[in-house]
């Protein structure tokens, strides 16, 4: 019987639940796009029956008469009976008589053969007829060739008796709104086909029930309670099966029940609720629950196995017959797009590509987008040993297989295999979950690849490989552990050994089918959590298995794990199953659910189809109780989330404090192992004669043109804070008494590193310059020294002038900290750490680049502004060396940048704080110019833009202010 809700169709169709479409007047012209109007109503209210119009393949439109279901026609005394009904009932009676007449020893094999024959007539016979009708219109052609429905009065019908017999049979069954002579040949052929189907289906079910009766017995030593439980469970399954069939017929009517769309199409409003919201393919999935209920009541493995065989044959019928017809009828490929006229393309205006750059200005790289990637070489379902991921999976699995086979099943090895499976499950759920959580919150995974100059697509490919390897290895380790814990039963007939294996295998098959259904619904993109990586316009759809369950992986997705528990009958496997289920639920609740709520918000569906169906069937008292339980659970979850949210900042603050303290300790560590050298005798040196003043390039915010305004900052500017540009040279002017030591030196320190103003206790780590040449045995001490011991007069506080020595030095390059913070210079005496003078504190800061304040160019791009802002910073990072630093954005960096990584490290630090993008130093070397680096920054900002917290005034959707 046709399942009207089985196909994951992308267009409107009989088998797809869609929203109700507005009614239109039915005319032959409007029936051309008939299937586009075959809508379904999500509500459970059944409207009064309306006239249904049908259309044949040649376009003939006719009124479809109302027909009754098979069981009512055959068994209801109020329904008129004809010869075909009597024939069907007689054959059913022969089955009953045969069961009574056969000896007990022959009943089981005979009825097994009879049932399998009728099942073959169903799945193979009817399947072949439908296949031929779908592809070649065979049944209609047979009827036309035999002229079965041609009036004998025309002289063209060679079988007048058969004509009158068929006419009487059909008109007896359809007394209203039906004319045998005027009905299309497709409709009459379908009615005759129905009678054949009635015979096969009734005999199929009857022979199955009689086979179960023949096999029925009571197990030895079965207690009354077990017998009561067995029969009550079996009857419940049979009643549930009966409800499924009746509800399905109520929804789909005879048209879908008897595969009417193989003959003609109809236009009607169907109500797909009830059973069609509970499970996919309900006629072929939960619609066979009664078979297993009968098997349970019969207490026979023979009935169970023949039920499984019949169920499998029915799924084969679905896959080989129905689904191809559904795809062909309701999911036809779209018409080919029209090819653009070449003449039109030649006349396209050059300026039509407003977002393109000149070829000489654009680096030879493609811009990765933020839309969903097109999968041309899927990772799931295709094995390619040219790919690292597939080869790694193969090698690891071969290693697992070999290690599992060669090691004995001793307790220590079993423990190791279970431990290995547990660790892989923890990584697969907790480790992968942490990566996705950080990706959802900060896009950390993507940022890592952007840091090394890669794009979003590379991050996506690497993530696919990691996830695929983790998933397959997790299950491979679980299978290996199950193999080690499994022992063959010594007596298959003892206890529930066979049942455990059958149920376990069924659960494993259920998990495999669930995984396939999830992948079919989500595709490669959804399978690998693509919405964590790509910012498409959020559009949530519920198709395939997700029409019935919100999270199928919560239960059905782990059915095979519990199947392994049943098969192995091991407590260790129970532990692994509980661990797997707990971690999977935690993954859904803590990772998937928050991301889905953030991404889709209120468009998330609260109840799936199955939950809706169950809730509608509950009494009001249970509904209220269920609502109270849901409220308690929601409040508990909210409380836990609130506690976590409250504790997170404190934990983060504690971690940050620990990191800062540790960092400061490392900064101070050289001083802890170095004895501070102090000058014991400072007599004759007046501290008032020592002084330090600083000059540097003052930092200003970027102006509207994208550049920077630079001024010289003097120490005489009063109380105004000094803020210097990152990497810019800093000039220091010092004064000291004429008799100052020739081994005096000036060091650069962070203000927070020294608590004492008399003694320096922290090493300068090479950031110092001597006041005089030749005073130290190191040439680096003189780098930056400009002048020394220049006599000048200084005005004292008492107004008296005195002669002092002065000098200048410039701190640049390696003499700078290349960090942000507040710094100071300290003047030290005679090569020791006595502090004679301290400069005014000043701050080194990197200005944030705000693209909202930068006007776009003619192409809507901010890259020129980024180039202008980046150029002076890069020049500073390259020491303003004419052999290394570029003079403009197009000029390449000097070769020294490739040889010494310190230059690239300075640049990436500046870029990170300036634009909020972290690159690896290798990116700077690879780009080789400011222009290419600016392009990469634009590209990275485009990739990371969806995760930016700042409002943009660019070309994105405007945000309405309150």
Swiss-Prot record:
<feature type="transmembrane region" description="Helical">
    <location>
        <begin position="196"/>
        <end position="216"/>
    </location>
</feature>
<feature type="topological domain" description="Lumenal">
    <location>
        <begin position="1"/>
        <end position="85"/>
    </location>
</feature>
<feature type="transmembrane region" description="Helical">
    <location>
        <begin position="278"/>
        <end position="298"/>
    </location>
</feature>
<feature type="topological domain" description="Lumenal">
    <location>
        <begin position="131"/>
        <end position="195"/>
    </location>
</feature>
<feature type="compositionally biased region" description="Basic and acidic residues">
    <location>
        <begin position="338"/>
        <end position="351"/>
    </location>
</feature>
<keyword id="KW-0444">Lipid biosynthesis</keyword>
<keyword id="KW-0443">Lipid metabolism</keyword>
<dbReference type="GO" id="GO:0097038">
    <property type="term" value="C:perinuclear endoplasmic reticulum"/>
</dbReference>
<feature type="transmembrane region" description="Helical">
    <location>
        <begin position="415"/>
        <end position="435"/>
    </location>
</feature>
<keyword id="KW-0949">S-adenosyl-L-methionine</keyword>
<feature type="transmembrane region" description="Helical">
    <location>
        <begin position="393"/>
        <end position="413"/>
    </location>
</feature>
<feature type="compositionally biased region" description="Polar residues">
    <location>
        <begin position="352"/>
        <end position="361"/>
    </location>
</feature>
<feature type="transmembrane region" description="Helical">
    <location>
        <begin position="492"/>
        <end position="512"/>
    </location>
</feature>
<keyword id="KW-0489">Methyltransferase</keyword>
<protein>
    <recommendedName>
        <fullName>Phosphatidylethanolamine N-methyltransferase</fullName>
        <ecNumber>2.1.1.17</ecNumber>
    </recommendedName>
</protein>
<dbReference type="GO" id="GO:0006656">
    <property type="term" value="P:phosphatidylcholine biosynthetic process"/>
</dbReference>
<keyword id="KW-1208">Phospholipid metabolism</keyword>
<keyword id="KW-0812">Transmembrane</keyword>
<feature type="topological domain" description="Cytoplasmic">
    <location>
        <begin position="299"/>
        <end position="300"/>
    </location>
</feature>
<keyword id="KW-0808">Transferase</keyword>
<feature type="topological domain" description="Lumenal">
    <location>
        <begin position="513"/>
        <end position="571"/>
    </location>
</feature>
<feature type="topological domain" description="Cytoplasmic">
    <location>
        <begin position="107"/>
        <end position="109"/>
    </location>
</feature>
<feature type="topological domain" description="Cytoplasmic">
    <location>
        <position position="414"/>
    </location>
</feature>
<feature type="transmembrane region" description="Helical">
    <location>
        <begin position="463"/>
        <end position="483"/>
    </location>
</feature>
<feature type="topological domain" description="Lumenal">
    <location>
        <begin position="436"/>
        <end position="462"/>
    </location>
</feature>
<keyword id="KW-0256">Endoplasmic reticulum</keyword>
<feature type="transmembrane region" description="Helical">
    <location>
        <begin position="301"/>
        <end position="321"/>
    </location>
</feature>
<feature type="topological domain" description="Lumenal">
    <location>
        <begin position="322"/>
        <end position="392"/>
    </location>
</feature>
<feature type="topological domain" description="Lumenal">
    <location>
        <begin position="245"/>
        <end position="277"/>
    </location>
</feature>
<dbReference type="GO" id="GO:0032259">
    <property type="term" value="P:methylation"/>
</dbReference>
<dbReference type="GO" id="GO:0004608">
    <property type="term" value="F:phosphatidylethanolamine N-methyltransferase activity"/>
</dbReference>
<feature type="region of interest" description="Disordered">
    <location>
        <begin position="1"/>
        <end position="57"/>
    </location>
</feature>
<dbReference type="InterPro" id="IPR016219">
    <property type="entry name" value="Phosphatid-EA_MeTrfase_fun"/>
</dbReference>
<dbReference type="InterPro" id="IPR007318">
    <property type="entry name" value="Phopholipid_MeTrfase"/>
</dbReference>
<feature type="compositionally biased region" description="Basic and acidic residues">
    <location>
        <begin position="38"/>
        <end position="52"/>
    </location>
</feature>
<feature type="topological domain" description="Cytoplasmic">
    <location>
        <begin position="484"/>
        <end position="491"/>
    </location>
</feature>
<dbReference type="GO" id="GO:0032541">
    <property type="term" value="C:cortical endoplasmic reticulum"/>
</dbReference>
<comment type="function">
    <text>Catalyzes the first step of the methylation pathway of phosphatidylcholine biosynthesis, the SAM-dependent methylation of phosphatidylethanolamine (PE) to phosphatidylmonomethylethanolamine (PMME).</text>
</comment>
<feature type="transmembrane region" description="Helical">
    <location>
        <begin position="86"/>
        <end position="106"/>
    </location>
</feature>
<feature type="topological domain" description="Cytoplasmic">
    <location>
        <begin position="217"/>
        <end position="223"/>
    </location>
</feature>
<feature type="topological domain" description="Cytoplasmic">
    <location>
        <begin position="593"/>
        <end position="962"/>
    </location>
</feature>
<feature type="transmembrane region" description="Helical">
    <location>
        <begin position="224"/>
        <end position="244"/>
    </location>
</feature>
